[in-house]
Amino acid sequence: MGFSSERLMFRPLLASDFTAYLAVYKQEAPLYDSGTSSRPSQSQLETFVQGTREYFIQRKLIHYAMVGIFLKKPDGTEGELIGDGGVFLLDNRDEKWPEVYYVLKKEVWNKGYATEFVKEFLRVWWSLPRENTRMRVQALSLGPFFYRQEAQEQLGAEISMNNKGSIRVIEKAGFEFCGFLEGKPEMGYWRLVSPN
């Protein structure tokens, strides 16, 4: 399944995308400055590369829903792979809501692509079929209603407070700031409650 926006195309990544995909992550600091996560350690990068290989070779990616982000050529066809994005933590093992993420090549920053991706991805994400379920989540994610037993579905985003670009992207997409992560005052948490 693929979808697109005005300047971008999004689709599941294929084995033929692997080399271009790893090139995005071999840049100086694509995760730290462009996405919604903190700088990964060497062991996290090694685990990521191994998981990525499994995804491309065996399609084994259960805890993520991700797509490649491609430029759209003037004729409307798929262009260069410039990053990936989606949601992770779908298994709720850390008692967190699924979190939105994106990573873009440094040379395409500050062109509105991250905002364009997040807005279009959210449109597709919220249109997917749902089932009622029970899960434990962090109280911080519930905002002022942390005492409630039930909550409407939402997406989260953990972002370094130094990452002003990602904060702007998330807020343009409608996410609201909830506070700082416990024990990590440099990391903020944003949430977006389902519009449905």
Set out the residue ranges of the language-model regions.
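Conserved G/P- and acidic residue-centered "switch" motifs that form tight phosphate/ATP-binding loops
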Residues: 79, 112, 163
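Short beta->alpha junction loops/turns
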Residues: 38, 160-162
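Conserved hydrophobic beta-strand within the GNAT/NAT acetyltransferase core sheet
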Residues: 155-159
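Conserved short alpha-helix immediately C-terminal to the canonical SAM/SAH-binding motif I
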Residues: 117, 163-166
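Conserved active-site tyrosine of GNAT-family acetyltransferases
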Residues: 170
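GNAT-family acyltransferases
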Residues: 1-107, 122-152, 176-196
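Conserved acetyl-CoA pyrophosphate-binding loop and the N-cap/start of the following alpha-helix
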Residues: 108, 112-121
